[in-house]
Amino acid sequence: MKKYLLFSILIVIATIAFAQKDRDTIPKYLKSPFIPAFKIVQTNGTNYTKDSLPAETPLIIMYFSPDCGHCQIQTKEMLDSMQYLQSATIMLVAYKKMEVLIEFSNHYELCKFTNIHIGRDPKYFLPSFFNVKFTPFIAIYNKKGEFVKAFEQGASVLEMRNYL
């Protein structure tokens, strides 16, 4: 009887141990190295999607938080050096409330820049896709829509322009 009980316990433990799946540690953006099918709601209320992107244009996606000091510094640096980033479409994406994004956009006068799109990711798709741990997170795609580089804690304009 003891042998039967011990054998049963071992079977249960083995079943539980082998039932555990290894967590997939490779982020989705590395598995699928092309621009994802995203949808953000811009501060003007319109949707901006992958299909909205201009053809043959590099893309910079910056996932940020408007109240993050590093994100504010990153934004200012990008705006001050826009001559180096003018050839790219820049998406500033956050999860915060739209009112906060509008305030951020107005503060930095983002509407002056035709290549910048700021909006909210209401489904939290992009941070999940990029496995964002810190903000600002920056992903760069080339003219063909192929993933080039990710910066997990922001990047200088010089670093970014090297990948455009």
Can you name each region flagged by the protein language model?
Residues 1-25, 164:
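Bacterial Sec-dependent N-terminal signal peptides
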Residues 20-51:
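N-terminal "domain-start" segment that seeds a small globular fold
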Residues 35-36, 59, 135-136:
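Short loop/turn microsegments at loop-to-beta-strand junctions
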Residues 50-72, 78:
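Short active-site neighborhood of thiol/selenol oxidoreductases, capturing the structured segment around
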Residues 57, 134, 140-164:
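Thiol-/selenol-based redox modules, centered on thioredoxin-like
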Residues 72-110, 125-128:
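Structural microenvironment flanking redox-active thiols in thiol-disulfide oxidoreductases
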Residues 108-139:
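Short, internal strand/loop/helix patches
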